[in-house]
């Protein structure tokens, strides 16, 4: 795990910046991270093996459920908004403007993309 101004988890899409506040999301146990998502940032449909708890710190962050990315079916969360994505629930997210979110949960934090082609770990180098 590195924090180089981009992301500290290789399974997140590039463009966002992440800071670990507590714990280690790559290891067993509780963790809390903050993610700064720039305008236009999108996370395609995916799941996690454990619940994901998201709090919007600033800006507007959008989430939706299902195996297809559909902004019309999503929900906008303003600063102070909170949502829990249960383990294995297919969901996606995006920001139209700059947003900062806090994610907390139980590690190890893993992402499984519905479409393997969306997984940045599968990108050609």
Language-model features: where?
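Solvent-exposed coil/turn segments that connect beta secondary-structure elements
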Residues: 26, 38-40, 88, 98, ...
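Glycine- and acidic-residue-biased ligand/ion/polar-headgroup-sensing regions
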Residues: 38-41, 47-68
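Short acidic-glycine-tyrosine-enriched beta hairpin
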Residues: 24, 40, 61, 67-88
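Structural recognition of the beta-strand scaffold that forms the well-ordered cores
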Residues: 20, 45, 54-55, 83-85, ...
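A short, N-terminal "cap"/entry segment at the start of jelly-roll beta-barrel domains
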Residues: 1-31, 118-125
């Amino acid at each position: 795990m590195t924090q180089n101004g981009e992301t500290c988890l290789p399974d997140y899409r590039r463009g966002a910046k992440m800071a670990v506040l507590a714990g280690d999301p790559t290891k067993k146990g509780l963790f809390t991270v903050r993610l700064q998502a720039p305008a236009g940032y999108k996370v395609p449909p995916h799941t996690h093996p454990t619940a994901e708890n998201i709090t919007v710190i600033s800006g507007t962050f959008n989430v939706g459920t299902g195996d297809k990315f559909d902004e019309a079916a999503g929900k906008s969360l303003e600063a102070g908004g909170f949502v829990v994505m249960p383990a294995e629930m297919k969901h996606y997210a995006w920001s139209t403007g700059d947003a900062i979110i806090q994610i907390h949960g139980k590690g190890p934090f893993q992402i499984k993309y519905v479409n393997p082609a969306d997984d940045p770990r599968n990108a050609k180098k």
